[in-house]
Every structure is written in structure tokens, then in C-alpha cells.
Amino acid sequence: SRGLGDVYKRQAQTIDIVPTLAEFFQIAPPEYMDGHSLTPVIRNDTPIRDYALFGIFGGHICITDGRYVYMRSCKDPENQPLYEYTAMPCHMDRPFSREEMSEAELCDKNAFNFMKKSGVFKVPVHHSTDSYRFGTMLFDLLTDPEQKCPIHDSNIEDHLCQAMKKMMKDNQAPKEQFERIGLTE
């Protein structure tokens, strides 16, 4: 039986937390919600997803199947095109500058389903995390759980790259994200 402090080794994403809480409190999640309840994992270790997509804004876009972690970097040092999409033009600690807003454009209201036809700004970003200097990396969590020694396996990389493209499409990643990391949509 599972208890406090147990570790679950199934793929999950942050977006799975709200559906889990909604199920616990017997609230129907909105139809546009992409996450999955973690209840099957918690109750009987049943997987809810084959892959987890993650990353950092403007940095690596990553995917894992639980065994391997594939970290795709930007294709060139300029790390472009890169845009911030926001309904609230603020950074964590300050509002966007006049210069930033002068380059902003209002997106098509149908650009993202989850915005429910609300407008969002598309703001060019000219500085970000430098994933290029690290390059694209592949790790085997079975032999290298601390991800210290990247491996090279084109078959695994191709497989995870295809899964990454599918998940990016499913999550409505803007088309320029594919271009930024050198993938065709």
C-alpha cells in the first residue's frame, strides 16, 4: 500500500494538479482543460500520460518518457523568433516598458482556445535564457539519474522529437516556437 513519502514514477505535469483537485472536490473541470487527474496514479500506479512536456521560457523545450529526457535548444545564438504572449503586460517585478509595448501587437482572438476569444498581446523578446551554449541534450535517467552525461542516440532522439512536436501542437505552441528550436511544424 502507498503512504506518506512514497515516490511515484509516472509522468505528470503541473496542468494535472487542477483536474486532480477538481475530481477530489467533485467539481467538473472546464472542457478546455488539458490536464489529467492524478487519481489513477495515486490509487494504483496507472499511467495517465506517455510523455511530459516541460521547459523554461526562451530556453530548452524538454520532453520525457520517464526513461529519457530530451532537451531541445534554440537553433542559433539569437534565439529568435521569441515572443511573450500575455493578457497582462507585466514582468514578475515590473510592468512592460514603453519600448516593449511599442513592439507589441494584439493577437487574433482565436489564436489560443484556452483564452476563450480574449485578446492577448504578442510582445517580441530580445533577451532570454541562453540554451544555445548548452546545445540539445539527451539523457538516460536509468543510467544517469542526475543528468550529468548526455548520450547520443539518433533513434531515441528522433522518437522523442516526434512526440515533442505532437505535444507542442496539442498544447497550441505558437508556430515560431517550432522555428526557434529548428523543428518543422
Predicted regions: what is each one?
Residues 49-53, 154, 178, 182:
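WW-domain-binding short linear motifs
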Residues 9-65:
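Polar, surface-exposed loop/tail segments
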